[in-house]
Amino acid sequence: WTFYLLLPIFPLLLSLLGAPETRLTTLSNGLRIASEETNQATCTGTKKHPQSALEQAVESMGAHLSAYTSREHTAYYMKTLAKDLPKAVELLAEVVMSSSLSEADIEQQRSVVLRELEEVQGSLQDVCLDLLHATAFQGTPLGHSVLGPSANARTLTRNDLVEYINSHYKAPRMVLATAGGVNHDDLVALAKQQFSGVSFEYEGDAVPVPSLCRFTGSEIRMRDDEMPLAHIAIAVEGAGVASPDIVPLMVANSIIGSYDITFGGGKHLSSRLARLAAELNLCHSFQAFHSSYSDTGLLGIYFVTDKHKIEDMMHWAQNAWMNLCTTVTESDVARAKNALKASLVGQLNGTTPVCDDIGRHILNYGRRIPLAEWDARIEAVTPRIVRDVCSKYIYDKCPAVSAVGPIEQLPDYNRMRSAMYWLRF
């Protein structure tokens, strides 16, 4: 049955089935090791290596060590030659388990974070999407930005950091992932040697319990008539990463697509909303997005437009949502499925994104979902499924809206809410 389902794209299926296998091993303390062998955040110092010595050790290997934080995950990653794997694992273990957290290092990173906060304020897209999370998930952890307020960065102490690490850096919550010329058995042996000391127990009743992140239909406006363009995002509550509705919503987002004023094509663009944007000069750019978290998500459209086109663009954006719920066609879905498959494959171009993908999959699903399985799930989506799932998440739902800039023309929230359904018989 599965073979029959994938028969129309048999050449693609053959290439996906031939993709490298991701192997997974769990240590006795709960730490998971995942690797995929192929043929081709800021870190402070550790107790063994001060920050300057750590940087020198990484540079002497010709490697790259960094870190990043998202709303649900923190990652430390290193890119290095295969022959330096033992040293790389040792350094990562030191960073995770033995950070020195000296006052000098903390003060240095404090200034780095404050500078990053200033840079984020200069990215109006980041500001708009942070405001969207703040209003959509108000009063919950997802409502906070990744960097947090500047007051926190200025007042954070060493004791705060130590308490956080002791509460959250536990083996069952960690994944050691690799991609490239790495033998899985060798990696497991190195992990046992370097990470076996990671605790899997919590002190007393200190087990962190995830907070329920409820969605609230609401709006937040930051009007500034001196700005040249308006930045606006509208979203409804989406599906969590493990929801069976995630793939139909990805297809739906692919139907809406994205647009930039620099695109060629004009009225010949594949996305209906993109064609309207080009023909009617509705906006400078827009993109459909779906931010998925463990138990919820945001399904939305972000656009940048002239202050005189806000009402028109908002109308057609919501109209595109209503079309997904009522009149999406076979050709729309077929085009979107092809675009989505190409996007998923293109995102794994290199060992760094592959490694990141492995780590997130193990944390979210407990396994790495192969591309062949994604392909099968996407191919199983039909127009009826898209209409049903979009009706479940979009139709007659309260949206969350964030807007920054010259937004006098942005409709009243009640008008935007009333455009989330059609009075048709």
Where are these regions (language model features)?
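Aromatic (phenylalanine/tyrosine) cluster motif
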Residues: 3-4, 10
